[in-house]
Amino acid sequence: MFENFLSFSRGGTPCHVDSFRLLLDIRVSIERMLDQRMLTTLGISFSQGSVLVQLAGGGTVSQQDLAKALGCGTSRISRLVHDLPNREWVVCRPGRGDRRTRNLSLTPAGLALARQIPSVLAQAGQAVLGRLSVEERRVLGASLARMLDEVRKPRR
């Protein structure tokens, strides 16, 4: 999606314009890798896995609350959740006070699947970071944490 914006090629070698675009490129590449690993290993997309992990926190969650927790819109959640009841991983029920509200909870099979996701993510993390030294990981972690703090600061 962002490939043309993120990088261009000179002599077959990608040249990243700046660090920010490099970060975007890394994000896109990691998301693709996670999707591929999740689909291959568990038969679900990374986004669907995120839904299952969030629901594994316990109890029943409204689609609206799930969207807030995952930082996306309710229409995106509707699309992600659409197939999960058919695969018997999630139960969708209308809300008690408002029938338009949909409440979601995991089935035992959905919980079992959600419990497999952390190991797939750990393997992906090792694939991405495994060749970095301990010191490189430390510096990267500190830099990324600082950047995240900056991004999360309230702006006027």
What residues fall within each predicted segment?
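Charged, amphipathic alpha-helical coiled-coil/dimerization segments
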Residues: 6, 60, 82-145
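Pre-recognition alpha-helix immediately N-terminal to the DNA-recognition helix
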Residues: 18, 33, 50-53, 112, ...
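Alpha-helical linker/hinge and terminal dimerization helices associated
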Residues: 26, 30, 34, 70, ...
